[in-house]
Amino acid sequence: MTLIAILTCAAALVLHTTAAEELEAESQLMEVGMPDTELEAVDEERLFECSVSCEIEKEGNKDCKKKKCKGGWKCKFNMCVKI
């Protein structure tokens, strides 16, 4: 019973941390001061850059090297976030 409680607590903590990181990433994107339409385009572009590029390279039987986010951004939870 104790093990189940510990595992449940750990899972809740991981989910909470992930949600908090995503909220932080969104708030950092909003601080840039771009209009919403431009912000959505940048967000989609950066999300693709982090998460899909590695999968495309793997399909070609090559070593997977994730693309790095550029211009003061870093990849975190498959999203580029402002440093």
Swiss-Prot record:
Tissue expression remark: Expressed by the venom gland.
Chain residues in the propeptide: 21-46
Phylogenetic placement of the source organism: Eukaryota, Metazoa, Ecdysozoa, Arthropoda, Chelicerata
One Pfam family of this chain: Toxin_20
Role description: Postsynaptic neurotoxin.
Gene source species: Cyriopagopus hainanus
Coiled-coil region list: none
Protein's UniProt name: U4-theraphotoxin-Hhn1x
Location relative to the cell: Secreted
GO molecular function list: toxin activity
Family: Belongs to the neurotoxin 12 (Hwtx-2) family. 02 (Hwtx-2) subfamily.
GO CC terms in record: extracellular region; host cell postsynaptic membrane
Superkingdom of origin: Eukaryota
